[in-house]
Amino acid sequence: MHAWPDPSVPAVAGTPVPLKLFDTADQRVKEVDTTPDANGEVGMYVCGITPYDSTHLGHAATYLTFDLAQRQLLANGHKVHYVQNITDVDDPLFERAERDGVDWRELGTSQINLFRSDMEILSVIPPCDYIGAMESVDEVIAMVQQLLDAGAAYELDQGDIYASIDATEQFGYESNLDRATMEEYFAERGGDPDREGKRDPLDALVWRGHREGEPAWDSPFGPGRPGWHVECSAIATNRLGSHFAIQGGGSDLAFPHHEFSAAHAEAALKVERMAGHYVHAGMIALDGVKMSKSLGNLVFVHKLSEAGHDPSAIRLAVFAGHYREDRDFSDAILAEAEERLTRWREQLAGEVSEAEATEVVDKLRAILADDLNTPEALSLLDGAAGDCNQIIATALDGLLGVRI
């Protein structure tokens, strides 16, 4: 599946600073392992959308977070192999299509196209591999077979196959949650703890046997379709190898999705840890209230763009808060971002020496390399009044994706 056009990302002046990010598994900020893989690249996998509804600013904020991370790596001279999936076969998609009386494939295609447009508007660097679940069914089948062969999965009635949480000793390391919280989140976030016959309530579905009215693919263990978590396990490791640098997504994916996608890959491939970093972006609220379709308070990127808001201002509004925090979005925050952008553009006429400009860029690099500290970065640039010459403007584009 094709992604969206690649924005021009300029080279950045100044001295590279190793990127450090907060790792959910280790519960600390640590340096990203940028040891290149066999292809000379640093691997990053970010979970994509389930295309059953319009993507909103909360989704966009997650992808802007990892766009920032990629920009710091690129500015440091690394080649990044970025992979993103699309869960284009899943229950929420089928349910929404049935509710609206449309074909689930058509619904998925329309929402994927809108997502692509949003990402292009925001100058998000596209993934090298943009992979739909339907494209990767053969890869999932192969991984499920590996789990069965390893004794890490078992079959129940109706052709359903589950992966055992005790297949790896390290299960639970990624999210650091206690058992009670795991069970609560598993039930709330797509799990089926009460499924009769399961060896453990937390065992996750990796293959759903065919039900009437649902799409299905042939496999050695019968017709059916992939489970949610194992899709990401297969897509990521088939492109980035059994171990890669960054697994990312929103904070709501830390458990169960990222815990299980790691566990499935580790059990199938017999590795201790799938990703060096598990990185999670906080949620976005509108005027202090979490964005929710039921509340009717979703903010859509394409609507902001149609209303004439500058994409660089939208980025600055999101970057006003730290990526790991649950944070607010409001008309006032967007207006402040637009004022900031206008002020910076006016400063472009300022004349400073190359040495002075490079000093500002070096400070900006160091701040962003420290767990993507955008609030401090914006403060630095606000304080550089009159110093925003072309060297700094280019750094803003390269490091923040903000065009002056």
UniProtKB/Swiss-Prot annotation:
It catalyses: 1D-myo-inositol 2-amino-2-deoxy-alpha-D-glucopyranoside + L-cysteine + ATP = 1D-myo-inositol 2-(L-cysteinylamino)-2-deoxy-alpha-D-glucopyranoside + AMP + diphosphate + H(+). A motif ('KMSKS' region) lies at residues 290-294. The keyword Nucleotide-binding applies. Its cofactor is Zn(2+). GO terms for biological process: cysteinyl-tRNA aminoacylation; mycothiol biosynthetic process. Keywords: ATP-binding, Ligase, Metal-binding, Nucleotide-binding, Plasmid, Zinc. A motif ('HIGH' region) lies at residues 49-59. A motif ('ERGGDP' region) lies at residues 188-193. Pfam families: tRNA-synt_1e (PF01406). GO terms for molecular function: ATP binding; cysteine-glucosaminylinositol ligase activity; cysteine-tRNA ligase activity; zinc ion binding. Binds 1 zinc ion per subunit. HAMAP family: MshC. Catalyzes the ATP-dependent condensation of GlcN-Ins and L-cysteine to form L-Cys-GlcN-Ins. This is L-cysteine:1D-myo-inositol 2-amino-2-deoxy-alpha-D-glucopyranoside ligase. It comes from Corynebacterium striatum.
